[in-house]
Each structure stands twice: as C-alpha cells, then as structure tokens.
From Swiss-Prot:
Gene that this sequence comes from: dsbB1
Record protein name field: Disulfide bond formation protein B 1
Annotated keywords: Cell inner membrane, Cell membrane, Chaperone, Disulfide bond, Electron transport, Membrane, Oxidoreductase, Redox-active center, Transmembrane, Transmembrane helix, Transport
Record-linked Pfam families: DsbB (PF02600)
Annotated compartments: Cell inner membrane
Entry membrane topology: Multi-pass membrane protein
Organism expressing this protein natively: Pseudomonas putida (strain ATCC 47054 / DSM 6125 / CFBP 8728 / NCIMB 11950 / KT2440)
Stretches that traverse the bilayer: 15-31, 50-65, 73-89, 145-163
SUPFAM superfamilies associated with the record: DsbB-like (SSF158442)
InterPro entries: DiS_bond_form_DsbB/BdbC (IPR003752), Disulphide_bond_form_DsbB (IPR022920), DsbB (IPR050183), DsbB-like_sf (IPR023380)
Disulphide bonds in the chain: 41-44, 102-130
Residue intervals annotated with topology Periplasmic: 32-49, 90-144
Length: 168
C-alpha cells in the first residue's frame, strides 16, 4: 500500500467516524425528545437535517474509490455543516434573546412539509418553540453544543483534506 492510499484510507475512517457521531447526535436528540419530553422547534429540526446530511455525505464519501469523488462529497459535508452553523447560530441567538421569536408561524409549515417530516414525523416534525429554554448539558444549551459540533465539522474536514493531501 503506497503513502497516498494510506492517507485516503485515514480520511475515509475519519468520515465514517464523523457519520457515526452525527447519527449518535440525532439519536441523543430523539432520546431527549421522547424520554425527557423536550419538544423540538423548527431550528432543532433543521439542525437534525444538517446532521443527517453530514452523516449521509460522509458515508458516501468514505465509499468513493477516487480522490476527486471523495473530495466532492467532503465538500458537501462542509456545506451541510455550514447550513447547520446557520441554524444553530440562529437558535443560540434566539435563546440568548428570548424576546426574539424563531418565527414558529412561518418556519413550522415549511419544516413540516419537508419529505422526512412525513416519512418519520417523530424525528422530523416540529412540536415546540425555539425560545423554550431547556436545562443545559455541561453548562451549554443543546443549540450551543450543536453549534460547536457544526463548527468543528466545518473546520476539521477541510483541515484533514489539507493535511492528508499536501504531500500526496
């Protein structure tokens, strides 16, 4: 096995791990929704979509045989993470400023009309308000943790690409 193949395999393992972490985060959100009764708002659902897109694109990227196709799907992972940053950042802003509403009247029908909301309503249908504060986990709200995860994804994936390919 040459050096370039070894580096690409390391990238693929990282992407599989990233996909599993994203699916675990969705599972944690579902646990909090079903067991702890924390109803998801439109921005929470959009963050779940971003996590799902990151996981799907990461798994597809890990299965790609060539470097070019791997890079294409890694770019889609980063774009999905940027979408998650927008949703989570907006949610963090709303939680910091409770007088601001997330627009439940305007966002809820749009989010509820997305295909996965009809296929799997438990996970992707809006039930709550964005301004509802829930108990923090290790000092941060769920939206803040999601923002951290999305920022790390948006930074670490391109950094890994650069690191693995600069000498290849």
């Amino acid at each position: 096995m040459n050096e370039q193949t070894s580096r690409l395999n390391r990238e693929r393992r990282f992407l599989v791990l990233l996909g599993l972490i994203c699916l675990s985060l969705i599972g944690g959100a579902l646990y909090m929704q079903v067991v702890l009764g924390e109803a998801p708002c439109p921005l929470c659902i959009l963050q779940r979509y971003a996590l799902l897109f990151i996981a799907v694109f990461a798994f597809i990227a890990a299965a790609m045989p060539g470097r070019r196709s791997l890079t294409f799907f890694e770019a889609l992972v980063v774009l999905s993470a940027i979408g998650g940053i927008v949703a989570a950042g907006n949610h963090v802003y709303i939680l910091a400023n409770p007088m601001v509403s997330c627009g439940i009247d305007t966002l809820q029908p749009i989010v509820d009309d997305l295909p996965l909301a009809k296929l799997w309503p438990l996970a992707f249908q809006v039930d709550g308000f964005c301004s509802t504060p829930y108990p923090p986990i290790l000092g941060l709200s769920l939206a803040q943790w999601a923002l951290v995860a999305f920022v790390l994804t948006a930074v670490l994936v391109p950094l890994g690409i650069y690191r693995n390919r600069r000498q290849a």
